[in-house]
UniProtKB/Swiss-Prot annotation:
This is MATH domain and coiled-coil domain-containing protein At3g44790. It comes from Arabidopsis thaliana (Mouse-ear cress). Residues 241-309 form a coiled coil. InterPro entries: MATH-CC_domain_protein, MATH/TRAF_dom, TRAF-like. Residues 3-125 form the MATH domain.
Amino acid sequence: MGYEKFTWVIKNFSSLQSKYINSDKFVIGGCKWFLKGYQNANYLSLFLMVATSKTLPCGWRRYTRFRLTVVNQLSDELSQQRETETWFDQNVVLSGNRHMISLTKLNAKKGGFLVNNEVKIVVEVDVLQVIGKLDVSEGSQEVTQPLKRIRLNDDGVSVKQSIDVNGFQVLPSQVESVKRIFERHPNMALEFRAKNQHVRTSCMNVLLSLIDTLCQSLQDISIDDLGQAEKALRYLKDSDFKVDWLERKLEEVKEKKMEEQIGKSRMQELEEELKIFKQKCSDIEAQLEKEKQKCSDIEALLEKEKAKSLAAARAPPLTLDDVV
């Protein structure tokens, strides 16, 4: 198929509010992708990710070779590049490099990587093998699957069946959770000015749904779920909820999920390396058997020559009659 390229320019890099940042989505090889970067300790980590990971059909796999490049805008020769080959599937939805470039080198004045507070990243993707189909065209905006949205209603339950907790009408099943939240974060809604009870209930449902998401196991949370959680958090902050504590928890979960995905990707890479190594060992063993057979044949030939030589040595000496 050959390489196809996507260029990502990260603007205002030095003033990013989050450790995590995503590129726009792009389509290569009939699949929608995006790039994810995050500042991990002393490095910028960079990964290629499947954008529609939660809606992939069963059996979907792509064997992909790709190159990630942090472009040096002063000299192409100084650009930082990493190349990877790996399978993407329903379990492994990202692959890349945790130590793409050191933050010291990236932020260096006149280093060429950060110019006008912009970082330029290029990914070149070559889909080598395709298993399963995913109908995504260059012009399509999304896979034809409904987007998951955090519910903003109360599932049709009437206000008469709700209970007031700190000025919020909540369901009986939500009372204990809401009380506990306000006990630990009493100032959470002090600046929340909405008077409409439907709006207030909607905001509380968003908050509870977000907390439910964060309480799931890492195996059950998808990358898409975390993307929806980020949107929910922005909605709450825009509504003047004080949810810094929740933002920190979301960052922790995102980091753990990223580590889990990186671990899966690394395991797959090691499995591929082990497979290649075992094949090499098998080839060496086969060659060794051939050499052993050659050695055995030579030993047999040597024994024959020894027998001939011994027989010749034991022959009686010639007599005068034999000579004359």
